[in-house]
Amino acid sequence: MRECRSQEASGQLTFAKTPRTVGIEEEFHLVDLTTRRLATRAPELLPLLPDGYVAELQSCVVETNGSVVSTLPELRADLTARRRVLVDTAATLGLGVVAAGAVPLSVPSEMRVTQTSRYQQMLADYQLLAREQLICGTQIHVGIDDPDESVLVAGRVAAYVPTLLALSASSPFWSDGSDTGYSSVRTLVWQRWPTTGLAPPATSAAEYDALISDLIATGVITDAGMSYFDVRPALRTPTLELRVCDSCPRADTIVLIAALFRALVEREIEGLRAGVPAAIVVPPLGRAALWRAARSGLEGDLVDLIHPASRPAGDVVTDLVQMLRPQLEASRDWQTVEELARRALAEGSSAARQRRAMRMRNSLLDVVDHLIAETADVATVANDALPTQRNGSDRG
């Protein structure tokens, strides 16, 4: 990776490696613009879209596969450009697009699993789990070339993953219109699959691969693609993949989470190479922390897994951002992340914003309209919030 010079706040000139690459996969609900209900029309929409848009398990969902980028301005530009194409194309069919963990209006009898052999086999094998998979998530990929490091870092970042989930929380309502009391009901639905949750305690790529082979041998999953751990080495690219997050109505939320995850990966690789012990997350505590993040979002307490205790979400998020300041400054992301984190805490999670929309007129239609509007809005952050890179950077 190329080194480039940067000027820190102290005035000292330092050298920083080119930031690790980032890529995003976003899942989007399709809704009928007349009824605001989920619409199983992805098979009609996808042929109208360019490459990079694909089907998902449910035919009311479309996924985008983003470009590989190195800077946050590039990332945001890619996210918003792909959203604009999807939103504009869907509108020609009378469809709205929603980036959120769940949408509060649907007719269960109208929902359809996508007609591919893989998805139909999943329906046959998992039944209710597949039928109720009316949820959308965001997957964030960060480049790691070494497979062994990828496996080890997946475990080392575990203590901070619940905080990233809380930042993304965008599913307070279930598809029957009920307020679940959670900020991310998607998490509860998702965790029913047999291979979700914390990354397994593997110490090498070979050990991780052996575990996946054993899971396939049990017949519980059919292939490695069904290893749905919260953080996992990606299957087809040299990246580490964060899978815990809800889909996010605001692209800026994804930019924030991606920047924090990239900084976490960098911090833990530095620690691994320096022999710094990893923070050990005991599975029951890790699961409790994920549950609490799904319950509270940014509006209640979160579990601090470093010193196990319940603490206000704002304090946990602020501490994470401050902890990662050296890595964020090295990648020239500090100013952007500090501003986006401040705004996230001031304005609340998407779940809280949806509940505010609901309280205005007690209307779920208003909630869906709010989500459609936020998803389509590509100008929510002033230009100076994502400063232009002064130094060019190589993709690594």
Curated annotation (Swiss-Prot):
Signal peptide: none annotated. It catalyses: L-cysteine + L-glutamate + ATP = gamma-L-glutamyl-L-cysteine + ADP + phosphate + H(+). Keywords: ATP-binding, Ligase, Nucleotide-binding. Its EC number is 6.3.2.2. The keyword Ligase applies. GO terms for molecular function: ATP binding; glutamate-cysteine ligase activity. It is an enzyme of class 6 (ligase). Belongs to the glutamate--cysteine ligase type 2 family. YbdK subfamily. PANTHER family: GLUTAMATE--CYSTEINE LIGASE 2-RELATED. This is Putative glutamate--cysteine ligase 2-2. It comes from Mycolicibacterium smegmatis (strain ATCC 700084 / mc(2)155) (Mycobacterium smegmatis).
